[in-house]
Each structure stands twice: as structure tokens, then as C-alpha cells.
């Protein structure tokens, strides 16, 4: 194989691999939980559909379409609102688009306020991004927070059941 063809082939293969590894940049993550709704958001590096497959079992069975806006650096921030949910119930969801079939995650909707059912929250300080130490937040969550919650409120290591809400106020306070 000639050097120019070999170079172009390597460039194509490496570029394709890099492209696919950069499609999902952030998330998915949950926002604006209420007893009957949940907003799922994620960020990609390409324009793609905004679809969440979801249901009350891992079989899923429902699809809801959403929207996206252009974020910083031309990233696309996707938003899908799930509606008609039952309070204090577990739901499973995943991103499903033309480029991504994501991992299945789960959440539990908050109880109705009048039920006065207890649930646990965590309030954390603004973590700020530190490019010199990008894994600090993940390390704190995985090495400290999750084991603490499981030990303190343990329910078979079911984080969605043990921890209902995480509040990171940032510059809001």
C-alpha cells in the first residue's frame, strides 16, 4: 500500500473512532423532577434527534421526542420532558437516536407533597471545573457520597430509592 493511501486510511479510521467517541459529551442527567414529570437532558457534539425511550420496566416501551439548542463550542444540548408519570414510581430510560443507543438508567418520581413521605436530599457546594483535576467531582461522588448514602440509608444499594435529590447551588446562593 502506498504511503499516501495508508496515511489517508489511518486518518479516516482514527478520525471516525474519535468522532464516535465524542458524540455523547455530557449526560444523560435529570432536571426539574415533579411527581408527574421529569426532564432528561444530555449534550452531544453533533446534531441528532432528541429521543428518550422509557417505561416502568427495562423493556421500556414508550418514546418521547424533545428539542435541542446549540450550547458552548457548538455542542448540542438536548431536552426531553417525560409527562404523565405516576408519583413515587420507578421509571427506566435511555437515549435513543440515530447515532446513540445509550445505557439504561432509572429514577423514582417524587411523592406528592400532601403524602408527606420522607425522602433524602444532598446539598453540595459549587464544584467548579478544574482542568488540572477533572475527575475530582466523580471521585467524591463514587468514593464518598454513594457509599455513605448506601451505608446510612441502605436499601440493597438502590441509589434511586435512597437518594431522591441532589442540589448543587453554584452561584445561586
Predicted feature descriptions by range:
Residues 22-173:
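Divalent metal-dependent phosphoesterase catalytic cores across multiple superfamilies
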Residues 1-23:
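Bacterial Sec-dependent N-terminal signal peptides
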Amino acid at each position: 500500500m502506498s504511503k499516501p493511501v495508508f496515511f489517508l486510511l489511518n486518518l479516516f479510521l482514527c478520525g471516525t473512532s474519535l468522532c464516535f467517541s465524542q458524540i455523547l459529551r455530557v449526560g444523560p442527567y435529570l432536571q426539574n423532577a415533579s411527581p408527574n414529570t421529569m426532564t432528561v437532558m444530555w449534550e452531544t457534539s453533533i446534531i441528532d434527534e432528541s429521543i428518550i425511550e422509557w417505561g416502568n420496566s427495562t423493556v421500556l416501551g414508550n418514546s418521547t421526542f424533545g428539542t435541542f439548542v446549540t450550547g458552548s463550542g457548538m455542542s448540542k444540548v438536548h431536552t426531553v420532558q417525560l409527562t404523565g408519570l405516576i408519583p413515587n414510581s420507578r421509571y427506566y430510560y435511555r437515549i435513543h437516536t440515530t447515532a446513540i443507543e445509550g445505557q439504561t438508567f432509572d429514577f423514582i418520581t417524587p411523592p406528592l407533597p400532601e403524602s408527606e413521605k420522607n425522602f433524602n436530599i444532598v446539598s453540595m457546594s459549587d464544584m467548579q471545573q478544574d482542568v488540572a483535576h477533572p475527575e475530582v467531582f466523580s471521585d467524591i461522588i463514587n468514593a464518598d457520597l454513594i457509599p455513605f448514602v448506601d451505608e446510612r440509608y441502605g436499601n440493597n444499594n438502590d441509589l434511586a430509592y435512597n437518594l431522591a435529590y441532589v442540589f448543587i447551588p453554584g452561584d445561586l446562593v
